Amino acid sequence: EGIATDPQKVQAVSEWPVPECVRDVRAFVGLASYYRKFVKGFAEIAAPLHNLTKKSARFTWQEEHQRAFERLKEALVTAPVLVTPDNEHEYVLDTDASEHSMGAVLSMVVDGQERVVAYASKVFTKCQRNYCVTRRELLAVVTFFRHFKQYLLGSHFVVRTDHSALQWFKRSKEPIGQAGRWIETMEEFDFEIQFRA
């Protein structure tokens, strides 16, 4: 039981021919984006295809685009069945940030096992890529708190991250600027942080 992809849409994705122009790429990414919550790291996988659709880009289909195209198709064909969210079980939010993107997995603990509710990801802007690792990790946490707010607000949940420097935020006396606003957002939620080793 849970939420699954529509077999007809997945078949349409799996049979999609290699794009021959920007319009084809946009159409494919648009259809694939409909199921982005089923694909871990969707934004990072799709980034080469998105780059082809920018106004400043020339359409030249290369190996990196073919790999991204095939990886997205494979990810959608093998997409997991997601658990239906409820407020009866504890949520776990795993976040991570790399140099180019951030991602999250929202899970629910059901019968002692974590079951995926949804995946989410986002490519960093040019400015955000210049942030230090701690700031990128904090941005990921805040972004996905907002993204999954309808599930997390009002519930106690666990946030797992691999960046232990984030523990400073709870002890920060008077944060200012951007970090202060992010921390203010986080204070709306009831959570504990766990660190992956």
Set out the residue ranges of the language-model regions.
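Short acidic, Gly/Ser-rich segments with clustered Asp/Glu that frequently serve as metal-coordination loops
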Residues: A97-S101, Q167
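C-terminal reverse transcriptase regions that engage the nucleic-acid substrate
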Residues: E1-H89, A165
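A short, polar/acidic, helix/strand-boundary loop motif
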Residues: A57, V110-L139, S164-R171
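Two-metal-ion RNase H-like nuclease active-site motif
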Residues: H89-A97
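Short glycine-rich loop/turn motifs
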Residues: A46, E90, S101-V105
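Alpha-helical recognition domains of nuclear gene-regulatory proteins
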Residues: A12, F28-L31, N51-L52, A75, ...
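RNase H catalytic domain
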Residues: V142-A197
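Mobile genetic element proteins and their domesticated derivatives, centered on retroelements
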Residues: D6, V13, G30, L49, ...
